[in-house]
Each structure stands twice: as structure tokens, then as C-alpha cells.
Amino acid sequence: GSVIGAANNKQTIYASASAQGAGSATQNLNLSVADSTIYSDILALSESENSVGTTTNVNMNVARSYWEGNAYTFNSGDKAGSNLDINLSDSSVWKGKVSGAGDANVSLQNGSVWNVTGSSTVDALAVKDSTVNITKATVNTGTFVSQNGTLIVDASSENTLDISGKASGDLRVYSAGSLDLINEQTAFISTGKDSTLKATGTTEGGLYQYDLTQGADGNFYFVKNTHKASNASSVIQAMAAAPANVANLQADTLSARQDAVRLSENDKGGVWIQYFGGKQKHTTAGNASYDLDVNGVMLGGDTRFITEDGSWLAGVAMSSAKGDMTTMQSKGDTEGYSFHAYLSRQYNNGIFIDTAAQFGHYSNTADVRLMNGGGTIKADFNTNGFGAMVKGGYTWKDGNGLFIQPYAKLSALTLEGVDYQLNGVDVHSDSYNSVLGEAGTRVGYDFAVGNATVKPYLNLAALNEFSDGNKVRLGDESVNASIDGAAFRVGAGVQADITKNMGAYASLDYTKGDDIENPLQGVVGINVTW
């Protein structure tokens, strides 16, 4: 539990062998430190004159301790030799470098760490269940042996592990994620002839992840994997797409109100309120996968006009929604406030047409958590969205309560482009567009329960997102954040006229496609008419 030296006043522990006349001289120094804190440099010094051989051997054993200091070897004379062996064990930590003309060997065991502070040269480096951190400097070694070892590098620098001789064993390589692009030409581990080292690792830079790959020359490089998005890439893509996801869910919620009025025998318009929410899973064209958990409330009022050939329904609504987003190690949220206007036309022959328009304002925030301890970066921006929807269909009834309602719907949405920064790096998102088509059929049955009328139904639909080319850019790289393609939706719901002046409705849907899955999406509403 002792402290040797001080952080601002390091001591130097050294061994020296010198000889001038005939014969030779040898000096051995064995240092063993346990459960201590050491602020000291180590020096192995050997001096010879008149071709007299001198040898200095220093053996430094550190266990369960923190050591801050450098290790040096120094030879003076053609017959001088200095040897330095450093052995760290049992979760010891060393902060320092190795330099000099003599021989130096470093061994780390049982959870020990060497934080290299300057360019270091050793003859042999052995790592067992321990870590070498070369983020600050390069290490040159003659041989390298690793058993469950860890190498920490800075992939945005050119600090490397250079092995001139044989390298063997297994090694995990970590580099903290960053927003900087990685030089794929830098060999972060170079090996000598007949090496059998197996090294693996993944990091991220800019929009993509980089996998540690062994080249044809036997050296190891970080190579960009364009099929794996980085945390920063996933977040900026999700933040571009999430407001569109929320806006489309709000459009579905408003459509549920229009459907409920059409199914009701008593609803002549009035005041209504709906809760809506759902769990969504999306994957963009740029390989960003994210989950979105949305909850919201919509409040509206409308009136129904009866005509000779049917009816009109006109109304307005406002909604508030929040979507909690998670992607990779990062998270964020989207808050939206929207205003809606809608108009429905119902004909006595069963044909109906629904239209709606919306304007929304969306606030987006996120915490980008870079992999491998790269830190957390905050991002935020606001945007506005404009959307419209048209739906047409036909209601067939058999006169005994059964009804079938085929329909087709097309909705379009555009979000304003935005510019913001991630830790000083420019991010640009183009206008984000969504053009969503849907065709389906609703099958239900109408029956009475006491004084109430209940209409349960099943719904089956096919959807397709047509919009593509929604680009986002981080620095000098860009990626497609679109979620296009087909999906299928199956759901069930019920509409009930509880009294002459009150109704209620609810629906629950499941949607699945190649790039989308909504395992749960629902609406619950109540309306009062007069």
C-alpha cells in the first residue's frame, strides 16, 4: 500500500555496470512491487571501456499496482549490454514508454494494462488476458505473443503495432468510434514472416463501420463495411425518417375517425378524441435499423351534411405525438404537433371518398453513443411537414349484417430539409418524402347488443412505399435514408354505437415487410354527437 515518488517529482531507479580494465562486470537488479503506487523511471545502464564486457540486468515485477514512469536502457561502449524485463500482473496499470539501445522485454498478465505514452521499442511483447493501449504512440517489437489479449488503437491516427518478427495468438482490437473517416491504407498491426496472429475488431468512422481485415501482405487494416451503418449514420437516418413515420401514423389515426363515422348509424358529427400508438421497426436503404415507440392523442370536431344522394363529413383536428427512438447504442426522440383538415363523401350506392391534409411541426433530439467508448454526441433539429391523403372504396352489405368494404388509399408527405451539426461536423438532410399506397378489404358484421349496435371487422391490406432517394449527408459522405418497398397489414377492430349520442371504436394492426415491421399499432376513440 506504499507510494514511491510523486507524480510531479518522479524518482529514477537504476542499475549500472561499468568496467575499464581486464575482465568483465555484471550488475543484476531485481525489483518487486505489489499493492503500491509508483512514480519512477527505470534505467538499465551499462558502460565499458577498452573492449571490456559489461552487462546490466534489471528485472521489474509489478503486481496489483499503478506505475507511472518510463523504462530506459543505455549502453556506452562496444562491449556494453543492458537488459530490461518488465512483468506486470494481477490488474496492474503502467503508464509510460520504453526506449534505449539495450534489450527490453515486456510481459502483461491477468488483467494488466500498458498505456503507452511515447514511441516504444521492445524485443518481445507478451500479452495474456491483458491490454496494450497504443492510442498515443507506436510500439515496435521483435516478437509478439497474445493469449486473449486486447489492443486499443486510435483508428483516426497513425499509431500502430509494428512486429518485425513472428506474431502469434489471438488478439481483440478496439478503436473508439468517431466521426472521422479512417485511412484504409494504414496497417494498424504489421507482422513479420511466418506469423499466425489472429486479430479481430470493429470500429466506426463517419457513416460506416470498419472491420479489421488481414491483407494479402499479412498486415491488419480497418476496411469500410458499407453494409453496416455507424451509430452516427443510424441516428441521422432515423432522425430523418422518424417524423415521416409519426406523420403517417397520424394520418392513419385520422382515417380511423373517417371510417368510424362511415360505419356508424347515429354519428352525425361532433367532438371526438383518440389515443393512438404503436411499436415500429424500420430499416432504411442505408442499413440503419431503428425502433420507434409512438404514443399520441388526437382531438377533433366535425359535422355531417345529409344530401339526396348521400352525405358529406367535414372536420378539423389537432394531434400531439412523441416517438422514442433507439438504434444500435444510441437513442433519441421525435415530438410532433399537427393540424388536420378532412372531408369525406359518402354515396347512397356505397361508394365513398375520403380526403385529408395535415401540417406538422417536429422537434428531434438524439444522443449518438459512439462504439468502444467513443463518447456521446448530442444532436437536435426542427422541421415542418406537409401531407395529404385520398381514399376511395365501396361498401357492400348483404342485408343480414355482413358487410365487405374494399378500398384503395394514397398518401403523400414531404418534410423540409434541415442542416445541423454533430460535434462540429455538418449534417444535411434533403427534403424527406413519402408516397404510400395501400389497397385492402375490410370484412365485418353488424349486430345489436341490447340498445347498442356493434360492428366488429377484420382488415387485410397491401402497402407500398414508392419514395426513394431521401439522402442525408455527414461531412463528405452521403447515404439513402429511405424506407421503400412493400408490406402487408392485418388487423381487427370494432365500432359501436353505445347510445344515440355516443360512439366508440378501436382497432389493432400488425404490419410486416422487408424493411418494416409494426408488431403493434392501435387506435382507441370515443365520439359524442348531437
Task: List PLM regions with ranges.
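Outer-membrane beta-barrel pore domains and translocons
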Residues: 74, 276-278, 317-323, 346, ...
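Outer membrane beta-barrel transmembrane domains
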Residues: 398, 414, 423-530
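Transmembrane beta-barrel domains of outer membrane proteins
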Residues: 164, 261-263, 293, 300-306, ...
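Extracellular beta-solenoid/beta-roll
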Residues: 39, 51-223
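Outer membrane beta-barrel translocator domains of Type V secretion systems
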Residues: 226-400, 509, 514
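Repeated loop/turn-to-beta-strand initiation elements of outer-membrane beta-barrel proteins
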Residues: 38, 67, 94, 307-314, ...
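Solvent-exposed, glycine/polar-rich loop segments of beta-barrel outer-membrane systems
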Residues: 235, 239, 285-292, 328-335, ...
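Transmembrane beta-strands of outer-membrane beta-barrel proteins
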Residues: 271-273, 312-316, 341, 351-357, ...
